[in-house]
Amino acid sequence: MTSKSIRRATAEDVAVLTQIRNDAHAKKVAHSDYAWGKEGDGFSEQWVRNNVSQKEVYVVELDGTPAGTFSFDLDDERHWGPQEPIAGYVHGLSVRKGFNGRGLGSFMLDWCANKVSGLNRRFVRLDCAVHNGKLCAYYESLGFIRVGLWPEPEPDGYVWSLYEKAAD
């Protein structure tokens, strides 16, 4: 039987989380999604270290092996603007190369839904680049509903699909 677990990331996880984020970045680039940067950009260990120290970053383990990561926040004014405290926001959902197709994405999002529910909030929210049709379809297959779009104000900025799903 396969064991899946989620725990809070620590400084000791930085190297493997950097690898996982870069694996996910490469997959996005392969689908012409440059929201995390173009080919060769990737994530540095310093960026991941800062993320781990400043946010709620989690490690997903499959049979004790780090296989995924994500961050969880209680607000996201950048993409969603000011909101009532009714949701939890997921960012950086990433699966390590070789671990795709094992249900880790849905496992992470179900875990987030349980956390949101435990905080007496109603929705799990996330965003993704609108032009990454495969990723948008994946989230929709998990029951997420696109409730809006957010265009970055920068010239040539991305347009983001804003998704939410009831946490119950």
Protein language model regions, located:
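Conserved acetyl-CoA binding element of GNAT-fold acetyltransferases
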Residues: 81-97
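Conserved GNAT acetyl-CoA-binding A-motif
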Residues: 116-127
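C-terminal "cap" of GNAT-fold acetyltransferases
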Residues: 129-133, 141-142, 148-168
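Conserved beta-strand in the GNAT
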Residues: 59, 65-74, 89, 94
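Conserved GNAT-fold acetyl-CoA-binding loop/helix
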Residues: 22-47
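A short helix-loop-beta-strand connector motif used in the catalytic cores of GNAT acetyltransferases and
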Residues: 46-59, 89
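Conserved acetyl-CoA-binding loop-helix of GNAT-fold acetyltransferases
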Residues: 95, 101-114, 137-141
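A short beta-loop-alpha structural element at the N-terminal edge
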Residues: 5-19
